[in-house]
């Protein structure tokens, strides 16, 4: 397999952490669409949202997805990447999609402990636990629909990588 592997899921599910470890295990390159967008725009996610609103952010997110989708690469996508049908179609057509599932309570705990919390603008203006429940209600079907593989993201990252390597029959680097 040389096609890109796209990691999808809500904020805090481990897309970046697991994606980096999976890329290392495969000898692939790793890229995070949010970080790619920050480098190309010179703005943080919060700055893009403040300057261009969520529609502008989603447009930039789609552009980043297409720019980074190259062979031998693991791509951590933004939590809302699945909101646009064109992104879901693109990922399914151009790679393998892995959904890292974690319950809302777990996601909220991780986000509260995250040092990057200030860079992640609130989607709803509600407390993080309520927000994550609302986000999963809105997006769960989209994550499930786009995914080739669904993985329990409450496991340690190394266990998730091991599971993916076995399930996807991926050769180690």
From Swiss-Prot:
E.C. no: 2.7.1.71
GO cellular component: cytosol
UniProt keyword Magnesium, yes or no: yes
Pathway assigned to this chain's UniProt record: Metabolic intermediate biosynthesis; chorismate biosynthesis; chorismate from D-erythrose 4-phosphate and phosphoenolpyruvate: step 5/7
Record-listed substrate binding positions: 34, 58, 79, 139
Needed co-factor(s): Mg(2+)
Function, in words: Catalyzes the specific phosphorylation of the 3-hydroxyl group of shikimic acid using ATP as a cosubstrate.
Protein name: Shikimate kinase 2
Species annotation: Dickeya chrysanthemi
The organism's taxonomic lineage, starting at the top: Bacteria, Pseudomonadati, Pseudomonadota, Gammaproteobacteria, Enterobacterales
Gene name as annotated: aroL
């Amino acid at each position: 397999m040389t096609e890109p592997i796209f990691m999808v899921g809500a904020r805090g599910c481990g897309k970046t952490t697991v994606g980096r470890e999976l890329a290392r295990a495969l000898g692939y390159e790793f890229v995070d669409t949010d970080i790619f967008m920050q480098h190309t725009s010179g703005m943080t996610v919060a700055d893009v949202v403040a300057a261009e609103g969520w529609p502008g952010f989603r447009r930039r997110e789609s552009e980043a997805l297409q720019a980074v989708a190259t062979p031998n690469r693991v791509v951590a996508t933004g939590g809302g990447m699945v909101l646009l049908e064109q992104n879901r179609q693109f990922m399914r057509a151009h790679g393998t999609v892995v959904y890292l599932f974690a319950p809302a309570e777990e996601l909220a705990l991780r986000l509260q402990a995250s040092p990057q919390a200030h860079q992640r603008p609130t989607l709803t203006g509600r407390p993080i636990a309520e927000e994550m429940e609302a986000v999963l209600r809105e997006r769960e079907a989209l994550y499930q629909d786009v995914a080739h593989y669904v993985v329990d993201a409450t496991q340690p990252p190394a266990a998730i990588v091991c599971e993916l390597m076995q399930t996807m029959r991926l050769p180690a680097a």
